[in-house]
Each structure stands twice: as structure tokens, then as C-alpha cells.
Amino acid sequence: MKKFTYSILIPSFNGLTLLKKHLPTIIKHSQRVDAIMIVDDGSTDGTVEFLKKEYPKVKVLHNRNNFGFPKSVNLGVRNVTTDLFVLLNNDVSVTNGYLESAIKRFDNPKVFAVTLNETTSSWPQVSWSEKLQYVRGEEKDRAHYSAWASGGSAIFRKSIWDNLSGFDEVYSPGYWEDIDIGWRAWKAGYTIIWEPDAKVILEHESSFNKFDKNNLNLIKQRNELVFYWKNITDPVMRREHLHYLLRHSLTHPGYLKVIIAAINKLPTQVKNEEKLTDRQILAMVNQPFS
């Protein structure tokens, strides 16, 4: 296995309680890491003061304002100087050996990211029927190619991340930015792997739980449409998606609000070279990795 340098990046907004709970475990099981960095997204709960006092070796980047997840991650990655970086939500705990089993996958220079095994879940089995459909894959003990790497628990190759221009901040405050960069990576000829032995525990306590549920649902649906309109270029798939929009708008009149919100987010500037088509990506993901 090649020797890589790697760091850990944790974006956090008013996550003092979560960091107190999960950071000790991350430090314990990440002994060979070169650096641990917290990007504090304008917290008002004493996070920065706590970290400086209790964890002086942890680097803290403090945003004066709340920028949202995609921009905070991008700001953090600009300060990463290692070959790889581990992106973790502040509500994630890790297990012993989670890094070693994933980092070996980067021996292949085409691997952009390795998404970790959130033990209550598995790899996303993706298909297309007027829009992306996915369920959790049943074969949980074997590595698989994955359409994307989770923005809350994955390892990324810094050089490729930079080539792809990072997360597209059009998705702020968050949701679908990880799917977007994953799809762009595949189109550019890179691969993503889900690694079953790299086990982490997701507590589902992130800052997004503090959002109004209706507003959060609007953000999710809006960003989903932005993803399709930006990334899906196959003519047949685009027509199928248009049929879905027309039908869904007629049967769910409130959906027009989602469409308008998505239109207002366009155009987005982050586009990358396309070596693979949408159909080729769909044929490659979901397959076992050997």
C-alpha cells in the first residue's frame, strides 16, 4: 500500500454538544492522521472557545457568518495540505481501523473518494426512472462502486477535489452537493468506492435537524432539481425528467414552488470535463469492486 498523508475535516455549526461526544473517539482511532481541522460555521454556543482550551492541537477555522455546509467545507479544504482528507459530520463516531481499510483503495490513482460504511446503512444502489432512484444495496460485506461519496463520512483525494472545483455552493445551505461532485467525478473519468470495512456510526443529530421541516424539505427538493438540470445531459433522460415535472406539478400544485426555487438557483458555474455519459455511469455504479 502506498503511503499517503491525510487529515480530518469536520464542519460544525453550534455543534458543541456533538463535538464533546464524538471528537474524543475520532482522535482515539485516528492516531496516524497528520491534522484534525474543525470548520466552525459561525457558532454561538462556545465551540471555538472550548476547542482552543480542551484541544489546542486541533486546528480551528472560524467563519464569522454562517455560510452553510458546501461553502464551509470548501473553505476548510483550501487549508488542507495532505494527499487525502476525511470529511466527517459532527454527529459521526468512528471505529478502530476505519481509516486503514479505506485508504488502501487510493492505490488506484483513478479513485476520487471512498465512502465509509455507516453501519445502519449500506451503499446506494442507483437507477433512473424519470429521476434518480436509489435503495440501499443488500450485499453489505463486499466493496462496491458508488455513484457518490457521503458528504458526512468519506475520504477524498485532494488533487482531484481541486480539479473538480470542490462542492458547488449553489446547493447551500446543503443537500445534494455530495451527489453533484460524485456525478461530476464519474463523468470526468474517476471512480468512487463504498468500503464495508471502514465502519462509522452516524447519530443523525446534525445541525440540519434544527431547520424548519417544511423549509428543509423545500431545500432538498429544490437542490434535487438543480442537480438534474445541471448534470443530466442524456437527451432521453432529460425528456423523461420533463415528463415527471409536468405530471408531478399537475398532481401536486405546491411543487411549482419547488420548481421556481430551483430556477432561481440557476445558472451554476461549476461544470467539468465529461468523459463518460449518464448512461455509462449508471452501468458502472452498483457493481462489486474487486
Language model features with spans:
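Short, acidic, metal-binding catalytic loop of nucleotide-sugar glycosyltransferases
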Residues: 24-33
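Glycine-rich, basic loop-to-helix element that forms the pyrophosphate-binding segment
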Residues: 63-80
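A short, conserved alpha-helix in the catalytic core of glycosyltransferases
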Residues: 147-165, 170-201
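Non-catalytic, C-terminal membrane-associated alpha-helical segments of glycosyltransferases
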Residues: 234-290
